[in-house]
Amino acid sequence: LGKDVTDKFLAGLPGIQKEGCDGLITSARFILHRLPAHGRTVCLEFFGSAREATPAIVEIKDYCDAHPDVLLAGLEHLDARYLKAVGYATKSPRATRPNMVLLIDIVSDDETAVGVAASKIVQLANARGGEGFIAVSAETRKKFWLDRARTAAIAAHTNAFKINEDVVIPLPRLGDYTDGIERINIELSIANKLKLCDALAGFFAAPLPLLEDDDTVADPAQVAEKQAQAQALVAAVRERWANYLANLDAPFAPPSPASGGGAGGEGRDTVARASWGGAGGEGAVPLTVFAALRDKQVRVSWKRELRRELHQLFVGREYTRILEACDRLHGEILKSRVFVALHMHAGDGNVHTNIPVNSDDYAMLQTANAAVARIMKLATDLGGVISGEHGIGLTKLEFLDDATLASFAEYKKKVDPHGRFNKGKLMR
């Protein structure tokens, strides 16, 4: 593990940890290393699933580690949520943002070698469905790194802060980790949309707000009919989405072309034809509901499945207040949606897992804390550790097992028998 600082082990180097339990620094000596004469910054954009793209991290690191003349100076990762938050401008001519970006710095005293290595890195990305762009000048290289410097933008939509917990994952398991985080995100997203359905069901069960004046008078019978149709729509969509959430590991059967459902999961037909009992017929490639949602073969969409249908149902000036109220409900509930965003110091497997939260929303904070617990378990289940560059502090203490804490307590007795170094820290 690249940045595992458990028991002072940092890639084999003895070290101190962030909690301030190891001693008092009275002096320090800094060693400056000469920067190699030539460098390249490579930006890699991946538009497929993160699971398929993530092995490129290991392949690029292995290639650079084995190169006799080129050093890997930086390897950073941003996921789709970060790219959206920073307003990432896609370098590829494609019309969509990538699902994953890698930013790589390589350096060498041999200009030819560093240029060839940059091209080889792009080829490695191409083999994983990625596209690559190479910056040579100092100005262009700096521009490539600007998006990485704006990662705090992930919390811009909340009024408070982000929970930022780091873990260390074995590089070969990064794909499994990103899949695990995506599953958490899908569950949180669907749960938030079910909350919206419940709010809409309550709204349509009550008298509806109508715009009535000298120019507009709503027909009571027509209003009652539309109200019943809206209630049925919300109930059907809620049932469909709840089925997804309850059956993420079940086989998913996409609709046949004859059924009229789109491959992208648009419209109600695609979702309604999801099969929980089989893999879609003889010869079909098994696909789980989770994988279909992750790869956007099917979507859970407020805009397409509810909002668009409601706008088609409530056509007319007299119904504008109804549609405005639905949009307000959506906006209010969306503010409380919890999601997890990732960026990594990918070269050493140090993953920063960020969850933006509103400090005045207790339920949101509880949901975020539950997500953190799942993330810590995911990391350790994959052979990783929770003691990365952020250390343990206070928030991770509950996730350390008794044996680990007992080992630290024994160490502390030896180096600090009088408890002068941050007394009581990391002690239960």
Residue ranges and their predicted role:
Residues L1-S259, G264-R428:
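Noncatalytic alpha-helical scaffold of FAD-dependent oxidoreductases
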